[in-house]
């Protein structure tokens, strides 16, 4: 798990969750570090 990524709020910009538009979505959590 990446500590910079909050479970309830995800920042989606590209393949990573590094800032950008704040969306509550699981799209960000589908990344390898969440699995």
Swiss-Prot record:
A cellular-component GO term for this protein: extracellular region
Database matches in InterPro entries: Insecticidal_knottin-like_sf, Toxin_28
Protein name: U1-segestritoxin-Sf1a
Task of the protein: Insecticidal toxin.
Gene3D superfamilies assigned: 4.10.40.60
Membrane-spanning residues: none
Renumbered residue ranges of the record's region Keys region for toxin activity: 31-33
Residues in the signal sequence: none
Disulfide bridge positions per record: 10-22, 17-28
Tissue: Expressed by the venom gland.
Keyword Magnesium: no
Subcellular location: Secreted
